[in-house]
Amino acid sequence: MADGVDHIDIYADVGEEFNQEAEYGGHDQIDLYDDVISPSANNGDAPEDRDYMDTLPPTVGDDVGKGAAPNVVYTYTGKRIALYIGNLTWWTTDEDLTEAVHSLGVNDILEIKFFENRANGQSKGFALVGVGSEASSKKLMDLLPKRELHGQSPVVTPCNKQFLSQFEMQSRKTTQSGQMSGEGKAGPPGGGSRAAFPQGGRGRGRFPGAVPGGDRFPGPAGPGGPPPPFPAGQTPPRPPLGPPGPPGPPGPPPPGQVLPPPLAGPPNRGDRPPPPVLFPGQPFGQPPLGPLPPGPPPPVPGYGPPPGPPPPQQGPPPPPGPFPPRPPGPLGPPLTLAPPPHLPGPPPGAPPPAPHVNPAFFPPPTNSGMPTSDSRGPPPTDPYGRPPPYDRGDYGPPGREMDTARTPLSEAEFEEIMNRNRAISSSAISRAVSDASAGDYGSAIETLVTAISLIKQSKVSADDRCKVLISSLQDCLHGIESKSYGSGSRRERSRERDHSRSREKSRRHKSRSRDRHDDYYRERSRERERHRDRDRDRDRERDREREYRHR
């Protein structure tokens, strides 16, 4: 009978696993690193939530209710109670959390697992802690929120999906607000009854309603103004836009650059390096493009920045501190100057990452005395990766200084460039002749001029054979130019002839019309004379008839 019950439980688990695989079919190709460090468990969250959070190991209560054994085999066979500890800074390590728990008298810690971003391996600001007794869990929930870890009061909650989703949503909102926030804002986000994570920091916000006393930080300050006041012994929040690294003592600035004022941050610990720098407009989780901006030399492990109030990012002069204040450098591209106050970069030569940090997102340690740059980028003389101005390949502007500075060419290179010049010359001449025969003299002249300039700019332009090519091109050019000018004069002459012929025709026409007009008037006058003569004759005839009648 017991075997039957076991078979039923096993089939129930298989069904759940198949359902989970059907639901999360698009997440089969997940990084192997996440599969190794995270215990697998079934949860009913949406697929988009699974992209941002690690899987939740089953608690003791879930094991009793489902009657199924956990997928991960633990070495500890006794009782196990899981808790969430949140509101931690992103640089809080498992050693820090272990020391804080041991200071409360809790020594039965079974597991500490930090929740991290899969994009860059950075901590989300909360962890899963497993203890071996109810008394230890109650002690943690009662006493740990009263302690401070790096200026933050931890929040302890039971381990269930509700609190996990709240932590994840809060971390996600912080990530989006940190990426979309403006550059150079001074002061933390506005205060209220419900505190949020400060922009730019991962997992630093307070859990809503977990610890009484309202918000930890005061209201926002306008950009360019002085920072808001903070209580004694409490560090101000970090500036927005990207998770900044803990800076060390500033070194000498590079030539022509001005270092920004030092920022307050966490002490640099040897067991947890800072995450990579996030520049504005860069896709989240991709390595920085081009060389990294030069930063201060790395501090000695175990020593952090000296105490004292940090200078403001912009606005009035900073208060006196251990280091003399420096004015911030001019605003510009993030790759041309040292890291501005809102983009502090990680110090080079950082120690290897802690066990819960993905080592694939951090570069290997380099020389601790020199600023690092991306191995794929050009040397830091030109931050935009432009080549030296004198290197222009086979073709460049003519000049004696450049010819003397060039290294001598080998025979193979010389022949290759010479063959190229011959091909350019022959093709240009043939095309120019065809264009000129078609009457397109402008295109022919332009083709020859371009070919001459290309051959003159080559590395072998001083050779006699190259000069012969240039002279042949110039002769062809002069011939086409003279032909184009001659055709123009012939056209002018023909036009003049046409004009003269038209003038003669017009003159002839005018003279003919005048003659015709005169002839017409002559004819008219003759007709008038004839009519007059006829009238006279009639009058005479009438007079004669009258005289005859009177007789």
Swiss-Prot record:
Amino acid composition bias (Basic residues), ranges on this chain: 504-514
Domain of life: Eukaryota
Biased composition (Low complexity): 207-219
Induction remark: Up-regulated during spermatogenesis.
Residue segments, region Sufficient for nuclear targeting: 510-551
Biased composition (Pro residues): 220-265, 285-366, 377-388
Annotated region (Sufficient for nuclear speckle localization), positions in chain: 404-551
Region (Necessary for nuclear paraspeckles localization): 81-161
Tissue distribution of the protein: Expressed in testis. Expressed in male germ cells (at protein level).
GO biological process, one term: co-transcriptional mRNA 3'-end processing, cleavage and polyadenylation pathway
Domain RRM span(s) in chain numbering: 81-161
Residue stretches of biased makeup (Polar residues): 169-180
Gene3D superfamilies in alphabetical order: 3.30.70.330
Location of the region described as Disordered in the Swiss-Prot/TrEMBL record: 169-411, 477-551
Necessary for interaction with NUDT21/CPSF5: annotated segments: 81-161
Renumbered residue ranges of the record's region Necessary for RNA-binding: 405-551
Post-translational note: Phosphorylated. Phosphorylated in the Arg/Ser-rich domain by SRPK1, in vitro.
Residue list for modification Phosphothreonine: 157, 404, 407
Motif (GAR): 202-206
Positions bearing Phosphoserine: 494, 500, 511, 513, 525
Alphabetized UniProt keyword annotations: Cytoplasm, Methylation, mRNA processing, Nucleus, Phosphoprotein, RNA-binding
Family to which this protein belongs: Belongs to the RRM CPSF6/7 family.
Subunit relationships: Component of the cleavage factor Im (CFIm) complex which is a heterotetramer composed of two subunits of NUDT21/CPSF5 and two subunits of CPSF6 or CPSF7 or a heterodimer of CPSF6 and CPSF7. The cleavage factor Im (CFIm) complex associates with the CPSF and CSTF complexes to promote the assembly of the core mRNA 3'-processing machinery. Associates with the exon junction complex (EJC). Associates with the 80S ribosome particle. Interacts (via the RRM domain) with NUDT21/CPSF5; this interaction is direct and enhances binding to RNA.
Domains (record comment): Contains an Arg/Ser-rich domain composed of arginine-serine dipeptide repeats within the C-terminal region that is necessary and sufficient for activating mRNA 3'-processing and alternative polyadenylation (APA).
Name the record gives this protein: Cleavage and polyadenylation specificity factor subunit 6
Source organism: Mus musculus (Mouse)
Name of the gene this protein is made from: Cpsf6
